[in-house]
From Swiss-Prot:
Family according to the record: Belongs to the XseB family.
PANTHER family: EXODEOXYRIBONUCLEASE 7 SMALL SUBUNIT (PTHR34137:SF1)
EC number per UniProt: 3.1.11.6
Biological role stated in the UniProt entry: Bidirectionally degrades single-stranded DNA into large acid-insoluble oligonucleotides, which are then degraded further into small acid-soluble oligonucleotides.
Record's protein name: Exodeoxyribonuclease 7 small subunit
Quaternary context: Heterooligomer composed of large and small subunits.
Organism from which the protein derives: Lactococcus lactis subsp. cremoris (strain SK11)
InterPro entries in UniProt: Exonuc_VII_S (IPR003761), Exonuc_VII_ssu_sf (IPR037004)
Superkingdom as given in the UniProt entry: Bacteria
GO molecular function: exodeoxyribonuclease VII activity
UniProt keyword list: Cytoplasm, Exonuclease, Hydrolase, Nuclease
Keyword Protein transport assigned: no
Main localization (coarse): cytoplasm
GO cellular component, one term: cytosol
Length: 79
């Protein structure tokens, strides 16, 4: 399960990525700076994607456990 520190880090990274996108969309960034910001944004994007994939896997495991427990409980009630 994610700790509070990990959640804040995810939110901070997401906010930073949104800030980069706004800068690039504004068009007020020099080419060299735009390239650097784009590269930074891509790295942040990969980090966010990894975090989301890990969270998804955790949820799949939890749901899988809950399904097994539910089936077990239903079987007990039939007896």
């Amino acid at each position: 399960m994610a700790t509070k520190k990990e959640e804040v880090k995810f939110e901070d990274n997401l906010a930073e990525l949104e800030n980069i996108v706004r800068k690039l969309e504004s068009g007020d960034v020099a080419l060299e700076d735009a390239i650097a910001e784009f590269q930074k944004g891509m790295k942040i994007s990969e980090t966010l994607k990894k975090t989301l994939n890990e969270a998804e896997q955790t949820l799949v495991q939890i749901v899988g456990k809950d399904d097994n427990e539910s089936e077990f409980s239903a079987e007990q009630k039939e007896y």
